[in-house]
Design a protein with these regions (language model features):
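Short, flexible, glycine/charge-rich loop motifs used to bind or transfer phosphoryl groups or to couple energy/partner
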Residues: 17-20, 46-47, 68-70
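Short, conserved loop/helix-junction motifs that constitute active-site signature segments
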Residues: 20-23, 50, 74
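Metal-dependent enolase-superfamily TIM-barrel catalytic cores that perform enediolate-based chemistry
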Residues: 12-16, 27-28, 33-35, 46, ...
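Bacterial c-di-GMP phosphodiesterase EAL domain
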Residues: 1-24
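Charged helix-capping and loop-helix junction motifs
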Residues: 13-17, 42-45, 93-100
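EAL-family c-di-GMP phosphodiesterase catalytic domain
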Residues: 5-7, 26, 30-37, 55, ...
Length: 154
């Protein structure tokens, strides 16, 4: 669930909302790299409190708007690498060592690293060796709800 500062403020000031949401431990709240105060990491009181109560996900990592501080501070359960970040680098000879360096820096500070932008088989082949926790992209188009069961059984 993508969250904004207004949603964070609501969640942190409404005990009823917190108690309801804590019943659903599978819910994760996503912030983008441009979230206000993100670069302050755990020194941002709202983000620090949110990370205590709920699993947080950092999306669009690599878009260029944030430092590694919030990741190093352990605020995020998951980090999702930015689609454009991947697309800009995937065809370069330096992609493999670059990705290994990024993962070496990020992976110890979260439970999983996800990659977005997997839009064709060529990109898929380039990222498979890195054992990402999950992949996202147009290689797997959206399906109607009634086809999900069939898709999973394939």
């Amino acid at each position: 669930i993508n969250i904004t500062p207004a949603i964070v403020e609501f969640l942190l000031t409404n005990e009823n909302a917190v108690s309801i949401l804590e019943r659903y431990p599978f819910l994760e709240f996503t912030v983008n790299e441009n979230y206000p105060g993100l670069n302050n990491g755990k020194d941002d009181p709202c983000l620090a409190r949110m990370a205590i109560h709920f699993p947080l996900v950092l999306a669009n990592f690599g878009a260029g708007a944030s430092s590694l501080k919030p990741v190093y501070d352990g605020l995020f359960k998951r980090v999702i690498l930015d689609k454009n970040f991947i697309h800009q680098r995937v065809s370069a000879l330096s992609f493999e060592p670059f990705m290994r360096a990024i993962l070496w820096q990020i992976a110890p500070h979260c439970q999983s690293v996800m990659v977005s932008g997997i839009d064709d088989h060529g990109i898929l082949q380039r990222v498979l060796p890195f054992n990402f926790g999950a992949m996202q992209g147009t290689l797997w188009p959206a399906v109607p709800a009634e086809r999900v069961t069939t898709l999973v059984q394939q």
